[in-house]
Amino acid sequence: MRTHYCGDVRSHDVGTTVTLFGWVDRRRDHGGVIFLDLRDRSGVVQIVSDPERTPNSYAKAEQLRNEYVVKVTGRVSARPEESLNPRLPTGEVEIYADQIELLNAVRKQLPFQVSTTESESVREDLRLKYRYLDLRRETMAANLQLRHQVVKAMRRYLEDEQNFVEIETPVLTRSTPEGARDYLVPSRVNPGEWFALPQSPQLFKQLLMVAGYDRYYQIARCFRDEDLRADRQPEFTQLDMEMSFMSQEEILELNEALVCHIFKQVKGIELPRPFPRLTYAEAMDRYGSDKPDTRFGLELVNVSDLMKDSGFKVFSGAVASGGLVKVLPIPNGNDLISNVRIKPGGDLFKEATDAGAKGLAYIRVREGGEIDTIGAIKDNLTEAQKAELLQRTGAKPGHLLLFGAGTAAIVNKTLDRLRQVLGRELNLIDPAKINLLWIVEFPMFEWNADEKRLEALHHPFTAPYPEDVQDLKTAQAQAYDLVYNGFEVGGGSLRIYQTELQKQVFETIGLSPEEAQNKFGFLLEAFEYGTPPHGGIAYGLDRLVMLLAGEESIRDVIAFPKTQQARCLLTSAPAEVDLRQLKELHVASTSQPKVNG
């Protein structure tokens, strides 16, 4: 029977006999004495097999190789002074093995080295194909342990400190496509009808408020069929919360306390409160993003009013058509950024055009306040405009000014992208710094140019401010996002809880009364039976753990993630299914079957 995990043996165990189970991380033979590093999910401890002191185990120790599974029973001893290993929590002790039992061997060559001492870089596709081996590695074990600690801290705080109740909501529900595409599941017993996997528990948690469960939470699995990137997965996990009879201020205060509790429990960090707040308008104006990384400066400057009368048609034309002209000022940019990078073919020019810009205009500030740029800008700014530009941007000799001109969406996306790239490149970001802030006062709606209609910026169940109800199209939402070092880790709002207002919002986003009734009739009816005022929030657990772990991809904090092509390399999912299964589901495929060979 196991007495300890490998990583838990300490100096206070010296003199005791312990039984451990684990994998051979490394085997070394020093002058006839065999040293084994034994590993389990808790860490590594050193095992010693000496032919004189532990003859019963020595023959077995000679047979062992990396990743063999063994049981070890032995006596804990203090390491000699010269053998202490301060890098390991178990580095003050070693275990003299009285018995070693081989439980299983490795019968194939390992696709990569698992040992904690190996520093080789392993291709991600190989790691994902052999994920069960990758999860044995020290970094991945630490990440999953961190994830567990985060969830544990969430549960303990919400249940023990705030009287929340954990309630599960359905995974098979109906499709209500308003955002990303749904994953659909055919119903065998109801031919021609389909379930959808939930993109969030949004409607069910609101119904729980109607039912009187005024403080609900759930560690919820969610599904979205969308294009992937480093911090997205087709299936992901949320901490989902909903509360009745609470104001926005009370919800924000409770959630700040929750986040501070998580940081204290899992990282030992005391976060200052209250968290800073920016309105959506302020964030977009200063940073070009509603999830700004505020660990560094490089704030944007709006010069639209200054450029509307300039002779440079790109700038004046952008303003005349309702767009913006903004500047990203870069101190010492003249020395740090060459012309090659900001002209066509350069990497920064490409960043701008990839964001939708038609080009990248710039000004270099020289000694004496002289400006150096392409002739079209220089020749079409008056001396007064030049002076005002330098004054507003705080530009000094050596500054590089990068311009964005066009629609607000393109200008903000372009300069936000450049700001992030240059912030990292110029080492302006302290990786140890933690900046958390709330973004508040979002617009209720944004214009969808492709579909030529308004759509909800968050979702159509978000409540407007009461004073904005008379003109919903320009209303601000009682919504809030939590931003952590440039990543949105949580988002929520107060909800609509009156039937008529909910119908008006559906109408504003282009849903006819018939469509609204067909998709959301059950919710509208529920609102007729005494619905309390309520609001909530959801945290992206994967993204939060990624940031706490210092990783760059959420795939490194998920046990069995999908690739950016939404595939599981371990199981080869998704895969074709047997024709008989499709017939049972009354489903026919429009894709041509794959031809083997």
Swiss-Prot record:
GO BP terms in the entry: aspartyl-tRNA aminoacylation
Enzyme class: ligase
SUPFAM superfamilies: Class II aaRS and biotin synthetases (SSF55681), GAD domain-like (SSF55261), Nucleic acid-binding proteins (SSF50249)
Catalytic activity reported: tRNA(Asx) + L-aspartate + ATP = L-aspartyl-tRNA(Asx) + AMP + diphosphate
Binding locations of L-aspartate: E178, R224, H458, R495
Keyword ATP-binding part of the UniProt annotation: yes
Annotated GO CC locations: cytoplasm
UniProt xrefs under Gene3D superfamilies: Bira Bifunctional Protein, Domain 2 (3.30.930.10), GAD-like domain (3.30.1360.30), Nucleic acid-binding proteins (2.40.50.140)
Marked site (Important for tRNA non-discrimination) residue numbers: H30
Binding site for ATP: R224, D225, E226, Q233, E488, G540, L541, D542, R543
InterPro entries the UniProt entry points to: Aa-tRNA-synt_II, aa-tRNA-synth_II, aa-tRNA-synth_II/BPL/LPL, Asp-tRNA-ligase_1, Asp-tRNA-ligase_1_N, Asp/Asn-tRNA-synth_IIb, AspRS_core, GAD-like_sf
UniProt KW keywords: Aminoacyl-tRNA synthetase, ATP-binding, Cytoplasm, Ligase, Nucleotide-binding, Protein biosynthesis
Annotated CDD domains: AspRS_core (cd00777), EcAspRS_like_N (cd04317)
Region (Aspartate): 202-205
GO molecular function: aspartate-tRNA ligase activity; aspartate-tRNA(Asn) ligase activity; ATP binding; nucleic acid binding
EC number: 6.1.1.23
Disulfide bonds: none
Subcellular location(s) of the protein: Cytoplasm
PANTHER family: ASPARTATE--TRNA LIGASE, MITOCHONDRIAL, ASPARTYL/LYSYL-TRNA SYNTHETASE
Subunit-structure text: Homodimer.
Family, similarity comment: Belongs to the class-II aminoacyl-tRNA synthetase family. Type 1 subfamily.
Described purpose of this protein according to its UniProt entry: Aspartyl-tRNA synthetase with relaxed tRNA specificity since it is able to aspartylate not only its cognate tRNA(Asp) but also tRNA(Asn). Reaction proceeds in two steps: L-aspartate is first activated by ATP to form Asp-AMP and then transferred to the acceptor end of tRNA(Asp/Asn).
Protein name (record): Aspartate--tRNA(Asp/Asn) ligase
Biological source species: Cyanothece sp. (strain PCC 7425 / ATCC 29141)
